[in-house]
Amino acid sequence: MFRNNNNDNNNNDNGFDDENKGIFLDSKIEISDETSLIHKPYHDDYDENGLINNNNNSHNNNNGGNNNNHGPSKVTHRRGKHTFTEADKLKMTKFESLDFPIIDNQIYREYIRRTSKLNHMLKTFGKWIICFMIGVLVGITAYLVKQSVEFVNEFKFDQSGKYLEDERKFIAFLVYYSINILFGVSASLVIIPVGQIASGSGIPEVKGYLNGIRIPQSMNVKTLVGKLVSLILAYSSGLILGPEGPMIHIGSMLGGAIGQVKSKTLKWYPKVLWKYHNDRDRRDFISTGAAAGVAAAFGAPIGGVLFGFEEASSFWSRQLTWRTFFACLIATFTTNIILQGFDMQLHDYGVLKFGLSNKYLYKYSELIPFALIGVAGGLFGALFVNLNAHLSQWRSKFFANKKIYLRVLEVFILITITSTILYCCAAFTPCRSKTQANGSQTNSLDTSSSSILSSSGDNSKNSTKLFKLLNNASGEDKQEDKFIAFFCEQGEYNQMAGLSFNSLDAALRLLFSTSTDIFTIPTLAVFSLISFILTTITSGLMLASGLFIPMMLVGATFGRLVGQVIALFVSVDPCIYALVGASAMMAGFSRMTISLAIIMVELTEGTQYMLPVILSVMIAKWVGDFFNESIYEHLIEQKCYPFLQSQPPKSMIKLGVVDIMKTEVVTLHEVERVSKVIEVLKSEQHFHNGFPVIERPRPLDPNRKDAYGNLEYYEDETTYSGLILRNQLICLLYYRIFCHEQPLPQNPRLLGGNSNRRYNQRRFGRPTEYGYAPADPRMTYELMTQSLARHFPPIDKMNLKKEEIETMYIDLRPYMNLSTIVANETYSYSETYSIFRTIGLRHLPVVNKKNEVVGIVTRKDLL
């Protein structure tokens, strides 16, 4: 049996835990030797900086959550096994769990009873306002990224183009290379003061947080600023990387910041919107921000919602779907309207947008090569994941215990390699006549749409511009494609320069062009191989970067290569093959399905190509799943995040809950001595974040019906009553919510008759068979919720008096969670895993048939 709670309201925020790491280490208060059941430690045990662990190595035996009952610590997912080393286990102890379930205590119930229907409506309306603000800010941020990168790239290509115009190849390369080094190294240096959490795409951190893991520094203001600056600089460095992953992380950080309206980094804790200061609401706002980031980056509001549902979030609801869709719509609208200069006639523009011709359809016989492209996408995607996983593992070992500036040197070396290869590829490629491309060009894709890396200015305004424009032969839509002269004579262009010496979205726009003769087959073959290798070695550098656009570029190049080979024998449109190849390659490394198909269709405006896209995506996922998991699953494992998959590991399904639970538990009584509470909180050997609360002692005589009971004789039982969190106990100590004596008085008639009875009922509550019910709570739900968001001082700085510590008690009954989920000791591992994962628990007490606490399960015990 387990007890559930269907209430969707707030739970207490545990966000201050990481800032209270000094509370227990500095205290020197003498306390009683009386203890509860002290045991081998259970988790969630450490603050998120792992400071307790640094002082006590005895706690490391169970870092992975496995005890001696079931062998070595390892994580097994759907395919393959990942074994954690001792160093990995030590890293895992840094991560705490979030408190998604509601803390349904007496003060919360009292708050609900006195809250009017209007206040409930205002809270719901406030969530919609916050989602609106998330959409607006994410849209503005996407616009700022686009404009900044566009300005830098225009400057870089203009300066290089001046020397290309004069055919000074080496000088042009030095200018191009120097600018790339300047911005690339700067993007890496920005990460040093912020922390490496700001590097990479940030998607593993978003997925981990939404799964219930409190990842240090992953959602704070400093990381947001560092990620944004590094993103802008990195995209101007000439490296093959994309903006989408960082935009998802940035959107998540904006969502968390707007919804909470507080900052632990800045130590700013206003009382505005205190109702949303809990992990559950913050989780929803972060999910909304992640989806809005996708919508703003791709111009795909529906795809953004589906990405949040399918890939990012582990917990979803119908209400969250509507609010997320609203935020994605606002983000896309905000980006578009700013890009157009607030033009009243809106077009389907986006930060990253490609248009395809609506005239040309595929034949059903082409579904066979589309399926084969899906197979190739799955194979190359699995290969990329495997290579990237090994490269990341090598980096973690090679750079361990070495100066961080070596990571900056790595960026310097990679920029040198990338710039040299891409420049030389263009320099040694022969020129082609524009008439060769014009001869078969039927329609080009929509370059009026703005892109993160493209220039929106008039590229033909003077002869020193790098880009030479080829007019569209179609008279229906006066559109233009970018071609690069690159030392070619007038009327000629360099086909490789259009791919290697160009922005990524401009290169994709050329690959999606319906002209069959823009690129030759050897050019596509060489560039597909080069881009795949460079993308593989670039991923994992110490700067903000994403993989979506680079892998789209690899897939589109390969797909167009296949299309042009087939075009030698039958009449086909290579741009469709480029679209299918891009979709297959993205599915091959990310294993996204529904959201990816919708994003690709919204991105290219090619709804008529839905069937080929879905076919290639599904086949690529099936093929990739045969070999390994997605790149993000591997990164989560390598970063030692205690991530709970939707299904339990198959290697552990034969176990029971008794095989994984911690059998000895630190418990507290419903009414506990202040000295005992301080002792438990200060314990370095047993640093816990949740404590089961057991019932008060009961009289020996079960037949006694006196309402006041004879409490001189009693037995100590461990019957489970509820759960109290560490931060709640600290809050009660800080505000001195104490009783002068234990509220279990003798029979009032023996202490002075009716007057004492009335006093005791006023002091301790109504009489029951075993004593007195809890007194009226002295702390409101509003005060506790607001207080839990702040930074409390160490216990020895709370000015607690010795008399208070030695003689007073804390009545935990008004504040403990009365509706916690519990598991019976007969439960299987699979059932326990499902309960824990589905509800998003932090602690799962295990009880026997008598409802006595026999163990406890936390996140790391399930891995």
Swiss-Prot record:
Residues 48-78, 434-460 are annotated as: Disordered. It is a multi-pass membrane protein. It holds the Pfam family Voltage_CLC. Residues 1-124 are cytoplasmic. One of its GO terms (molecular function) is chloride transmembrane transporter activity. Residues 49-71, 439-460 have a biased composition (Low complexity). Residues 661-742, 816-863 form the CBS domain. It comes from the Eukaryota. PROSITE patterns: CBS. Keywords: CBS domain, Chloride, Chloride channel, Ion channel, Ion transport, Membrane, Repeat, Transmembrane, Transmembrane helix, Transport, Voltage-gated channel. It is found in: Membrane. The chain crosses the membrane at residues 125-145, 171-191, 228-248, 289-309, 324-344, 367-387, 408-428, 518-538, 539-559, 561-581. GO terms for cellular component: chloride channel complex; intracellular membrane-bounded organelle. Voltage-gated chloride channel. Chloride channels may have several functions including the regulation of cell volume, membrane potential stabilization and signal transduction. Belongs to the chloride channel (TC 2.A.49) family. This is Chloride channel protein A.
